[in-house]
């Protein structure tokens, strides 16, 4: 047998097929792992915002990006001694002159981050018809204003029981 001639016996071919199969199986397993993507950045009156946080991976991602956004809103419903995350919240934010900067935007998860300019704002969040209001102050570059809206226990159930 020449130095450059391949052995054509079945054993090396079977071994190569098994190795190839193992590589493909490993690639399939790696591809099956959950990949978390940033929720889409959206616009309201020229203001960028992003909402999400459904599921532990996406919630962790939102907590990771929070420091890069000047305004952070978190939505929850009181549940005894703790609070559960709330989703499907409608948020409206007005600047100090009363102009709407976020116009009835829907938070698809318990977190919403927005690129608001430094200043004072009035924020109104609605869940199941119940409205909470907060005064919000956004600081200068490199700071993040965290604003938590927490509804009373059973708020989400009001809309579920009325249908």
Predicted regions located by residue number:
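Short, surface-exposed beta-strand/beta-hairpin micro-motifs centered on an aromatic residue
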Residues: 109-115
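Primarily secretory-pathway and cell-envelope proteins
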Residues: 32-89, 93, 130-163
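Beta-strand-rich interaction surfaces with strong enrichment in secreted/lumenal proteins
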Residues: 101-102, 112, 134-138
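Detector for glycine-centered tight turns/loop "hinges" at secondary-structure junctions
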Residues: 24, 34, 98-99
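Bacterial N-terminal signal peptides
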Residues: 17-27
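N-terminal secretory signal peptides that target proteins for export/translocation
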Residues: 1-13
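Short, acidic Ser/Thr/Gly-rich low-complexity loop/linker segments typical of extracellular
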Residues: 98-108
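A short tyrosine-centered beta-strand micro-motif
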Residues: 119-125
């Amino acid at each position: 047998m020449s130095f450059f001639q391949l052995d054509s016996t079945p054993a090396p071919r079977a071994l190569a097929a098994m190795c190839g199969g193992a590589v493909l199986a490993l690639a399939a397993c790696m591809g099956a792992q959950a990949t978390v993507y940033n929720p889409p950045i959206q616009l309201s009156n020229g203001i960028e915002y992003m909402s999400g946080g459904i599921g532990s991976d996406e919630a962790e991602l939102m907590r990771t990006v929070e420091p890069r956004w000047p305004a952070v809103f978190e939505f929850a419903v009181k549940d005894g001694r703790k609070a559960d995350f709330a989703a499907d919240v409608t948020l409206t934010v007005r600047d100090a002159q009363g102009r709407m900067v976020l116009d009835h935007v829907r938070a698809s998860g318990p977190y919403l981050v927005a690129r608001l300019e430094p200043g004072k704002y009035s924020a109104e969040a609605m869940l199941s018809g119940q409205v909470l209001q907060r005064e919000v102050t956004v600081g200068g570059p490199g700071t993040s204003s965290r604003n938590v809206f927490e509804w009373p226990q059973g708020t989400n159930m009001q809309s579920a029981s009325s249908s």
